[in-house]
Amino acid sequence: MANAKEIRGQIKSVKNTRKITRAMEMVAASKMRRAQERMRAARPYAEKIREVLGHLAQAHPEYEHPLMQVRPVKKAGFLVVTTDRGLCGGLNVNVLRNVVQKMRELHEEGVESNLAVVGNKGLGFLRRHGAHLVAELNGLGDSPHLGDMIGPIRAMADAYAKGEVDVVYLVSSRFVNTMLQRATVEQLLPVEKPTASAEQRAELWDYIYEPEARPVLDRLMQRYVESVVYQAVIEHLACEQSARMVAMKSASDNAKRMVDDLQLAYNKARQAAITQEIAEISAGAAAV
């Protein structure tokens, strides 16, 4: 058994670590609330664009954007969303596991993959595994803007429009609740042709375009793809802060239990030392 002095040092070290994890837990909780607010604020924008596209697609059934064209898959693209920092549990591990699994399935079918990656954690992992990266982005911070993400989005959209890839998957985490974040693989391109609901069809109206319809529809389609990726990034940020808060709370709780165990060991060591001293004194007195 370690002596009392060593145990006292361990207790001090664990208590200092617990102070750090408690502080990180509180910071993550604050950032999580702000990230959730941004996530909720962005949803209506993407939903409204989808709704407008549904109206326009119904009014102009002949319209087909290059990002909607379906063709046989010979090469795939991935837009992968991860975090810049760690200490967020298995959030990045789950996303990257989905990427590797999907790439392996495609490879078995003879389909190669190009990747655009957001976040240092994904970049480091995929570089080590020899993945073909065509775009990368890191350092978005806690308040990302759409303009910061245009590079990876355009890289994948342009590659699809030029026929360099035949399908693009968006891999990120979806926020279910504070305790649960689910890694998902969703098809980003080709965009499924928007359809109007029965209610929308009943209230269908025509639009007057200036100067003409196609540029408006083309721009809306680009904005829709951008909004889907932006929503995924800010939702992943909310997942990151939630996962970090839970991980730091778990670390703090474990540290508290460790301090309790060490305190018990310290008391036993101290009691054993006192008992030994008394025994030595008694033995010395008896010898005299």
From Swiss-Prot:
Domain of life: Bacteria
Xref: Gene3D superfamilies: 3.40.1380.10, ATP synthase, gamma subunit, helix hairpin domain (1.10.287.80)
Location relative to the cell: Cell inner membrane
PROSITE patterns in the cross-refs: ATPASE_GAMMA
Role according to the record: Produces ATP from ADP in the presence of a proton gradient across the membrane. The gamma chain is believed to be important in regulating ATPase activity and the flow of protons through the CF(0) complex.
UniProt-listed SUPFAM superfamilies: ATP synthase (F1-ATPase), gamma subunit (SSF52943)
Phosphoprotein in keyword set: no
Subunit structure: F-type ATPases have 2 components, CF(1) - the catalytic core - and CF(0) - the membrane proton channel. CF(1) has five subunits: alpha(3), beta(3), gamma(1), delta(1), epsilon(1). CF(0) has three main subunits: a, b and c.
Lineage of the organism: Bacteria, Pseudomonadati, Pseudomonadota, Acidithiobacillia, Acidithiobacillales
GO biological-process terms attached to the record: proton motive force-driven plasma membrane ATP synthesis
Record membrane topology: Peripheral membrane protein
Family: Belongs to the ATPase gamma chain family.
InterPro entries xref list: ATP_synth_F1_ATPase_gsu, ATP_synth_F1_gsu, ATP_synth_F1_gsu_CS
One Gene Ontology term of the molecular function aspect: ATP binding
Ion transport recorded as keyword: yes
One Pfam family of this chain: ATP-synt
Gene Ontology cellular-component annotations: plasma membrane; proton-transporting ATP synthase complex
Protein name: ATP synthase gamma chain
Keywords (A to Z) from UniProt: ATP synthesis, Cell inner membrane, Cell membrane, CF(1), Hydrogen ion transport, Ion transport, Membrane, Transport
PANTHER family: ATP SYNTHASE GAMMA CHAIN, ATP SYNTHASE SUBUNIT GAMMA, MITOCHONDRIAL
Organism in which the protein naturally occurs: Acidithiobacillus ferrooxidans (strain ATCC 23270 / DSM 14882 / CIP 104768 / NCIMB 8455)
